[in-house]
C-alpha cells in the first residue's frame, strides 16, 4: 500500500479494504465488496498509518490511565454485539471505568455504522446530547 508501484498499491489496498468490509457488517456474505482503487488506497493507507503508529498512543494503557481526565463528561458508547474489528469487551471495559457513560450494546450488529441498529443508536445518542 505504500510501495512505489501504483498497481501494487491498488491491489493490496483493495484486498485490505475488501477484508475489512467483510468483517465490518454482521450480514456480510463473507467477502468484501470491490471498492474503487482510489477509495481503497485512501482507506487502507489511513488505517494502516494508525496501526503502524500504534494508534498514536505512547503506551498501551494510555486510555485507561487517562480516564480520570474525562470522568465528569457524559458519554454514550454505541457498540455492536458481534463487532469483529473493535471487540465488545473493550467497550464494556471503558464503560466500567467511566461512571458517566451509558453503554448501548446493539444486539444484531457488527462494526459498520451503516448497519440499521448502529445507525439508530447513534442518532438516538446524538439526539440526547442535542440540548
Model-predicted regions and their roles:
Residues 84-90:
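Conserved alpha/beta-hydrolase "acid-adjacent" motif
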Residues 70-71, 77-79:
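Short beta-strand/loop motif that positions the catalytic acidic residue
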Residues 1-66, 73:
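Alpha/beta-hydrolase
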Residues 101-131:
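Catalytic active-site module of serine/aspartate enzymes centered on a nucleophile-bearing elbow/loop
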Residues 68-72, 97-98:
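Short, conserved loop/helix-junction motifs that constitute active-site signature segments
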Amino acid at each position: 500500500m505504500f510501495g512505489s508501484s501504483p498497481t501494487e498499491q491498488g491491489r493490496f489496498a483493495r484486498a485490505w479494504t475488501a477484508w475489512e468490509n467483510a468483517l465490518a457488517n454482521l450480514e456480510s456474505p463473507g467477502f468484501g465488496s470491490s471498492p474503487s482503487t482510489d477509495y481503497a488506497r485512501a482507506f487502507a493507507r489511513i488505517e494502516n498509518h494508525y496501526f503502524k503508529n500504534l494508534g498514536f498512543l505512547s503506551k498501551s494503557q494510555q486510555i485507561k490511565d487517562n480516564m480520570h481526565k474525562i470522568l465528569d463528561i457524559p458519554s454514550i458508547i454505541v457498540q455492536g454485539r458481534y463487532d469483529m474489528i473493535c471487540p465488545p469487551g473493550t467497550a464494556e471495559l471503558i464503560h466500567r471505568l467511566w461512571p458517566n457513560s451509558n453503554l448501548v450494546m446493539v444486539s444484531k450488529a457488527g462494526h459498520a455504522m451503516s448497519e440499521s441498529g448502529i445507525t439508530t443508536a447513534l442518532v438516538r445518542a446524538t439526539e440526547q446530547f442535542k440540548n
